[in-house]
């Protein structure tokens, strides 16, 4: 099953701030499925901001929070050992 890497962080002035960050490795059949699993895990409602194909940014409405998600290869999975697995 494909894996996805996601980061949820705060924003300042609309840009990612990384004052705090939560990282996730998600197993899902599609990127949309990965976002759905992350929505259930965190309780946030995400709205897509932009999509470059393999990389997407989502914002949480009425909150200074954003999420980045991308396809994860084995190098990324090995690099972030402290990322929560979903």
For each feature predicted by the language model, list its residue ranges.
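Short aromatic-glycine-(Arg/Gly/Cys) micro-motifs in beta-strand/loop hairpins
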Residues: 1-21
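Intrinsic-disorder-associated interaction segments
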Residues: 1, 27-31, 58
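Short intrinsically disordered coil segments
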Residues: 21-24, 39-43, 84-85
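Short, mixed-charge low-complexity intrinsically disordered segments
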Residues: 44-86
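A short, charged, amphipathic alpha-helix used as a generic interaction element across diverse proteins
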Residues: 29-53
């Amino acid at each position: 099953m494909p894996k996805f890497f996601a980061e949820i962080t705060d924003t300042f002035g609309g840009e990612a701030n990384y004052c705090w960050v939560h990282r996730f490795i998600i197993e899902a059949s599609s990127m949309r499925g990965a976002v759905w699993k992350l929505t259930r895990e965190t309780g946030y409602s995400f709205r897509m901001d932009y999509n470059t194909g393999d990389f997407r940014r989502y914002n949480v409405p009425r909150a200074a929070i954003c999420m980045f998600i991308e396809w994860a290869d084995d190098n990324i999975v090995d690099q972030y050992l402290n990322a929560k697995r979903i």
